[in-house]
Amino acid sequence: MTALDILHTWATNSDVEIDVVNDHHSVVVLPGEKKLKTAVSVKESHHSLDCQAFIIRRPDENHLTFATYLLRKNLELSMTAFAVDHLGDVYLRAAIPREAVTEDLIDRLMGEFLTVADSSFNELLVRGFITSMKKEWEWRVSRGESTRNLEAFRKILDPDSQKSDTHMSE
């Protein structure tokens, strides 16, 4: 049984979406809450199972704060690590020796991909895109458009939200 066979068995048993790219490459689609989907590209080589998930594009601002967050987060991770490509886009990566691959290991690995991608996403948005988010919020409010996909950031983006919080605490 190959490492990808074990991955496919895990995906089937866990009711997780998986797409076959070719005999040595599949993509696992993990459902999240903050980051709605995390697609993990899984490639089997002679020696390892190489996994990579796109997390977020290159930040628009606060590059040092953004990068520092990623490096500090790497200290907490056991199987995965954040990486940045030549464009500055952020990925989560892991390489597992083929002989170490079991369903249990795949479960823990995919769990870490999901947990880290989901728990880091909003923090990375705020650190790297706050100016754009504020402009988007103002534009939507001024036109009566929905702010539903920005609701998680209301306290940061809506100046009126902070005023009403102050009045409530008095």
Where in the sequence are the language-model features?
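N-terminal catalytic cores of peptidoglycan-degrading enzymes
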Residues: 1-61
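Short amphipathic alpha-helical segments
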Residues: 2-6, 58-66, 105, 109-112, ...
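Conserved short hydrophobic interaction patches
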Residues: 10-13, 69-77, 109-123
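A contiguous, mid-protein "functional segment" used to position or interact
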Residues: 100-139
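Short, highly charged C-terminal tails/helix-capping segments
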Residues: 125-170
